[in-house]
Amino acid sequence: MIKIYAPASIGNVGVGFDILGIAIKPIDKTLLGDCISIKPSKKFQLKNHGNFSKQLPVNIKENIIWKAWKYFNKKAKKKKTVKIVLEKNMPIGSGLGSSASSIVACVIALNKFYKTKLSKTKLLKIMGKLEGIISGEVHYDNVAPCYLGGLQLITNDQKNITQKLPIFTDWLWVIAWPGVTLSTSQARNILPLKYKKKTCIHNSRNLATFIHALYTKQSELAIRYMKDIIAEPYRIPLIPKFLISKKKIIELGALTCNISGSGPTLFSVCPNISIAKKVKIWLKKNYMENQTGFVHICKIDQSGARKMEKKNEII
């Protein structure tokens, strides 16, 4: 049996709409990511387990894992009957790369099971294509960091789709999912089709300065330019508690606060564990809509997707 784990990810990272993404892992070692197990079978089987498996479609052909299996068969020019078990640890429509986590884990597991030895670039293209089935267009800001780890800059160059960027390892990332879902397509459709030239220039300046600050190790400069002027202003109405939460946790000492991906998860960057714990406590009391919501203090997951032991230990 082959078992693969793929971590949660933050798309956009505030300043990089559709071109930045970062993989994360809770410091308490909670598995914030999906797992895929594959073994031989006389007929195709797909079993769903995990805390959020009930969110998955009842019709097997609507499940992204079934679509991944069909698409991979076509690309690999092989067809094998397998039993796939999806451990769904990520809520759908959370803004944490839930679909990317399932897709990445499944594609890697299939590649290993079939022994096709497809290159990382070819695998990434398959992942992006499958992600596009869900969101409506191919994009890599979740699948790339989920697969490769760290902070990824999406170039969309077909020979070199993504580049890994340096990131401050002492930052702590507090993520809070309120327990409700927000459709990625809905969050994308609310955005304008065109932006003013002034806005485009402003955003280009922010992104360029942020990346420059990463390479020159100027953390304060990076934080100042880690702003979202492309999506956040339009998505705020979809996330009623976001603005008040952002104001409060910055008062508590967080360095910044932004929407994770399409939302409704928010993320904040904290300079130390003391402030991160204060932010976590406040968000748990004030940002949650129900008991299924969660808050985690995270660090960067530099490894990305990887094999797992039988006892859910990450290799």
UniProtKB/Swiss-Prot annotation:
Q: What keywords tag this UniProt record?
A: Amino-acid biosynthesis, ATP-binding, Cytoplasm, Kinase, Nucleotide-binding, Threonine biosynthesis, Transferase
Q: Does the keyword Ribonucleoprotein apply?
A: no
Q: What pathway annotation does it carry?
A: Amino-acid biosynthesis; L-threonine biosynthesis; L-threonine from L-aspartate: step 4/5
EC number(s) per entry: 2.7.1.39
Class of this enzyme: transferase
Its recorded reaction(s) are: L-homoserine + ATP = O-phospho-L-homoserine + ADP + H(+)
Q: Which residues bind ATP?
A: P91, I92, G93, S94, G95, L96, G97, S98, S99, A100, S101
What is one process in the GO biological process aspect for this record? threonine biosynthetic process
Keyword Transferase applies: yes
Instruction: Cite the InterPro entries for this sequence.
Output: GHMP_kinase_C_dom, GHMP_kinase_C_sf, GHMP_kinase_N_dom, GHMP_knse_ATP-bd_CS, Homoserine_kinase, Ribosomal_Su5_D2-typ_SF, Ribsml_uS5_D2-typ_fold_subgr
Q: Where is the protein situated, by its record's location annotation?
A: Cytoplasm
GO terms (molecular function) for this protein are: ATP binding; homoserine kinase activity
Assigned protein family: Belongs to the GHMP kinase family. Homoserine kinase subfamily.
Q: What does this protein do?
A: Catalyzes the ATP-dependent phosphorylation of L-homoserine to L-homoserine phosphate.
Q: What is this protein called?
A: Homoserine kinase
Q: Which organism is it from?
A: Buchnera aphidicola subsp. Cinara cedri (strain Cc)
